[in-house]
Design a protein with these regions (language model features):
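Feature captures hydrophobic
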Residues: 1-153, 159
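Conserved class I S-adenosyl-L-methionine
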Residues: 168-176
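Conserved SAM-binding loop of SAM-dependent methyltransferases across substrates and taxa
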Residues: 179-190
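Conserved SAM-binding loop
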Residues: 207-208
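A short acidic, Gly/Pro-enriched loop at the edge of an enzyme's catalytic core
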Residues: 228-237
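A short glycine-rich, Lys/Arg-flanked "PGG" loop and its adjoining helix->strand segment in the class I
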Residues: 252-264
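Conserved beta-strand signature within the Rossmann-like core of class I S-adenosyl-L-methionine
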Residues: 265-273
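Substrate-binding/catalytic lobe of Class I Rossmann-like enzymes that use SAM or dcSAM, i.e.
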Residues: 273-389
Length: 411
């Protein structure tokens, strides 16, 4: 009776603050609607004990309860995330889960490899269900806004290669190469001699297969290797969706390594997710806690100001910064749509628990980018102190239609 009274009081409090298209189904068969609008989301509490997740509805608590099967939720992922954020926002105190907590973790080669395998080595077939055919698992670039996911991913890669002014025959290092889409494109379109490194065994195996199938083994070397173990120098370096795994304390060293690997007249691009909190705090309402526990162990997001500062500490000069937050919101929304459309195929590949984790994660990311809780920046940089005569004077070259040479045929 005590819990029931608490729940009744909580429902009254929420109703007094906002009208949500939410239905709560109780363990005794009764239900309560939180507005006169037809419910778009239903949360079922199977037991009296499960009411505690609503009484303290941080995203970590609600997400964990859904993943572990302690509550059931019906509705689209986008509606679920929006309503759960509203519950948290109207219940939690600012000094509690509402706060943007800063987390710091110990990073070394073994721990980083373990974290990467946890996230990326689900199965290639799993990722094939919701990514584009090239398996590009990073923010797409919607130049006009009406592109398909596949078109936008190709445009993203081309946008990057134009920004770094890749020239025919140059050497390129891609840190965190995924399934090889960027290095394959660079070799096909520019004849670039590429090295791609990843810590994911599944990515490594499939990327090598794709390189061989494209007839590009003479131009592309895919390695199962930590970026800290790479030697030599490269004309161009790209890092797309990787530096989030580096750790806040290690960013100066990360950029120092890029500086060391970059040729004197080289150019690099870092494309990564950032915190929108000036103090490098994680997403609010317990969202960051859920991501750390279930999705990205030891992931840390830096504010763009901190990224620029640590780049300079690493001996790099920033030439260009572009915010692609809205592009990632759309990318994640399309991934979520694909995920839900292929739910029947994904469940047996991932299992129910992992299916629920990713269902929440993808939609939650779309919401977080849309609400400016996190962001995405592409940063072009060079070794500090380059002579002006060796650098572009404007951004015009990035958008020139003839910026990319004719395709290079494999031989």
């Amino acid at each position: 009776m005590f819990v029931q009274n608490q729940l009744k009081s909580w429902i009254a409090s929420i109703r007094s603050k906002t009208a949500l298209p939410l239905r709560i189904e109780l363990w005794n068969g009764q239900h309560v609607d939180l507005s006169s609008e037809a419910p778009r989301v239903t949360i079922r509490l199977p037991t009296v004990a499960s009411a505690r997740y609503l009484l303290n509805p941080s995203l970590a608590n609600l997400g964990s309860a859904y993943v572990e099967g302690n509550i059931e939720v019906k509705g689209t992922a986008q509606d679920m995330i929006s309503i759960c954020n509203a519950l948290a926002r109207n219940t939690l105190k600012p000094e509690g889960k509402l706060a943007r907590i800063v987390r710091s973790f110990t990073h070394d080669k073994n721990k980083d490899a373990e974290a990467i395998r946890y996230h990326y080595d689900v199965s290639n077939a799993f990722y094939e269900q919701f990514l584009d055919p090239a398996l590009v698992y990073s923010c797409a670039y919607f130049e006009q806004g009406d592109e398909t996911l596949a078109q936008a991913q190709v445009k993203k890669i081309d946008h990057i290669l134009k920004k770094i002014q890749l020239q025919p025959g140059q050497t390129l290092l891609d840190i965190g190469c995924g399934w090889g889409a960027l290095v394959i494109r660079a070799a096909q379109q520019y004849g670039a001699r590429c090295v791609g490194v990843t810590l994911s065994e599944n990515q490594y195996a499939l990327a090598r297969e794709r390189v061989a199938a494209a007839g590009l083994a003479h131009l592309i070397d895919i390695r199962l290797q930590d970026y800290r173990d790479v030697t030599g120098q490269f004309d161009r370096i790209t890092s797309v969706g990787m530096f989030e795994h580096v750790g806040l304390k290690h960013l100066p060293n990360y950029f120092s390594i890029i500086n060391k690997l970059l040729a004197p007249d080289g150019m690099a691009m870092n494309h990564g997710i950032t915190s929108t909190d000036p103090d490098n705090g994680e997403t609010p309402y317990g969202g960051g806690e859920f991501i750390e526990k279930y999705v990205f162990p030891h992931g840390e997001l830096a504010h763009i100001g901190n990224v620029l500062k640590t780049m300079q500490q690493g001996g790099l000069e920033v030439l260009d910064v572009e915010n692609l937050r809205r592009h990632y919101a759309r990318t994640c929304a399309l991934w979520t749509e694909n995920f839900e459309a292929h739910a029947e195929q994904i469940r047996p590949l991932a299992g129910e628990r992992r299916f629920r984790i990713w269902h929440v994660y993808l939609a939650g990311c779309a919401y977080a980018f849309e609400q400016d809780l996190i962001s995405l920046y592409q940063i072009v940089c060079v070794k500090a102190g380059r002579r002006s005569s060796t650098l572009p004077w404007s951004r015009n070259y990035m958008y020139a239609q003839d910026a990319r040479p004719a395709p290079v045929l494999a031989h």
